From Swiss-Prot:
Binding, pyridoxal 5'-phosphate: A153, T154, N233, Q261, S281, S282, H283, T321
InterPro entries the record matches: Aminotrans_V_dom, Aminotrans_V_PyrdxlP_BS, Cys_deSase_IscS, PyrdxlP-dep_Trfase, PyrdxlP-dep_Trfase_major, PyrdxlP-dep_Trfase_small
Protein name, UniProt field: Cysteine desulfurase, mitochondrial
Gene of this entry: SPL1
Reactions it catalyzes: (sulfur carrier)-H + L-cysteine = (sulfur carrier)-SH + L-alanine
HAMAP family for the chain: Cys_desulf_IscS
Active site: C408 (cysteine persulfide intermediate)
Annotated residues for binding of [2Fe-2S] cluster: C408
Location(s), subcellular: Mitochondrion
Family label: Belongs to the class-V pyridoxal-phosphate-dependent aminotransferase family. NifS/IscS subfamily.
Length: 484
């Protein structure tokens, strides 16, 4: 059993930052605690809510009749609460309480349609929308007029991959991307192939980086667009954006980058890096879901066919009424990303180093990514645990929220195509787990995760015949396996 104390105060205090929290969040915490499989009591004098929740301790019986028991790591619930520890920030981030506070006023007082130009309700909302647009542009040194609001990075990637080639299709019929892009980029590229475009998929090396010479060789006279992800969502590898942008500019080719995992987390200057289009997602930077943006360069101008038409909003590139609460939250999240970038960077690097060292101290583990810190985002740590299935490990880690790859493909049983592109075999690709560290991750949580992973990897390997053979000194590569 472990006990959690949730104080009914107007603030939540982490060991590294003080956050304002609205009463809405307090009620949410209390509701979450009361609906979990736990025992809840309250103390009227101290204003404390006590929640006791059991931890499962699975036990299995191998064929020889012996018993293997999994001893749960000790969890200090006064720090962690009753829900699993969250280490899946590449899938989504929690909304920063200050972002929520900013959004709430747009559900009550500032409810005007920002496109209504005949009265004060529309004017005041439009003013706030433009303020948010400015905050978002400022992070990447762009002009606010170059920010086009969308529903998220998937729509933005579709807009770039489909919109630019369609506009120039009479003279340009070739697109270049990489084998490790997000699914929405790869699927959009395949869609354009069906429309008659040629697609070149650049390979990556064992650390996930493209070869710039491969890019130069792939360029043709009719190449219209190069799309390369800034930070990979599965392994955290940072591509050399400045060098890619320079190559594209010299060849008069448009350069698009999916920066959903990079925006606000690594330095990006669209002018210095010669980026023409850039995809942004709000919910990756502690903002609300359902809102994103596309940076579209104005000088030299980038032309594209819109994929959503109608009222002509957003410079005619993305029609539809904007959602002011989401836009305001997005803008506030962007402002905070720039304001706290130095602190976030230091905090994430510290915890990432600790987590990575702790995980790689386990025998037969492998880090998936780039060992050069210049090309590796520290908040994404992808590790393969040999001789066990990643899905089995996830099931044994019910008290930690993790994933075995992209959230968009996590339901698939197929091994990661990203790790395959790096040259990993099926076994290592199947045994990979992605750990995400963010602004609200604490050192105590990382300590617990390292201890829990050590225990449960050991537990699962004791049931693995392959692990038993390796421990017995058998070289698995020397065995001639036969199928029946």
């Amino acid at each position: 059993m472990y006990k959690t104390v949730l104080k009914n105060s107007g603030r939540i205090q982490r060991n590294f930052i003080f956050r304002n929290v609205s009463s809405t969040l307090q009620r949410s915490l209390a509701t979450s605690a009361s609906t979990s499989s736990s025992t809840t009591t309250s103390n009227a004098e101290t204003g404390e809510l006590h929640v006791s929740t059991p931890l499962d301790s699975p036990s299995v019986h191998p064929p020889d009749g012996s018993s293997i028991s999994l001893k749960s790591a000790t969890r200090d619930a006064s720090l962690f609460g009753t829900r699993p520890i969250y280490l899946d920030v590449q899938a989504t981030t929690p909304v920063d309480p200050r972002v929520l506070d900013k959004m709430l006023e747009f559900y009550t007082g500032l409810y005007g349609n920002p496109h209504s130009s005949t009265h004060a309700y529309g004017w005041e909302t439009d003013k706030e929308v433009e303020k948010a647009r400015g905050y978002i542009a400022d992070v990447i040194n762009a002009d606010p007029k170059e920010i086009i609001f969308t529903s998220g990075a998937t729509e933005t990637n579709n807009m770039a991959i489909k919109g630019v080639p369609r506009f120039y299709k009479k003279t340009k019929k070739h697109i270049i991307t990489t084998q490790t892009e997000h699914k929405c980029v790869l699927d959009s590229a395949r869609h354009m192939q069906d429309e008659g475009f040629d697609i070149t998929y650049l390979p990556v090396n064992s650390e996930g980086l493209i070869n710039l010479d491969d890019l130069k060789k792939a360029i043709r006279k009719d190449t219209v667009l190069v799309s390369v992800m800034a930070v990979n969502n599965e392994i955290g590898v940072i591509q050399p954006l400045k060098e890619i942008g320079q190559i594209c500019r010299e060849n008069k080719i448009f350069f698009h980058t999916d920066a959903a995992q990079a925006y606000g987390k690594i330095p990006i200057d669209v002018n210095e890096m010669n980026i023409d289009l850039l995809s942004i997602s709000s919910h990756k930077i502690y903002g609300p879901k359902g809102i994103g943006a596309c940076y579209v360069r104005r000088r030299p101008r980038v032309r594209l066919d819109p994929i959503i038409t109608g009222g002509g909003q957003e410079r005619g590139l993305r029609s539809g009424t904007l959602a002011p609460p989401l836009v305001a939250g997005f803008g506030e999240a962007a402002r905070l990303m720039k304001q706290e970038s130095a602190f976030d960077k230091k905090h994430i690097e510290k915890l990432s180093t600790k987590l990575k060292n702790g995980l790689l101290s386990i025998p037969s583990t492998q880090f998936n990514g780039c060992n050069n810190p210049t090309y590796q985002y520290p908040g994404c740590v992808n590790v393969s645990f040999a001789y066990i299935e990643g899905e089995s490990l996830l099931m044994a880690l019910k008290d930690i929220a993790l994933s075995s790859g992209s959230a968009c493909t996590s339901a698939s049983l197929e091994p990661s195509y990203v790790l395959h592109a790096l040259g990993a075999d099926d076994a290592l690709a199947h045994s990979s787990i992605r750990f995400g560290i963010g602004r609200f991750t604490t050192e105590a949580e990382v300590d617990y995760v390292i201890q829990a992973i050590n225990e449960r990897v050991d537990f699962l390997r004791k049931m693995s015949p392959l692990w038993e053979m390796v421990q017995g000194g058998i070289d698995l590569n020397s065995i001639e396996w036969s199928g029946h």
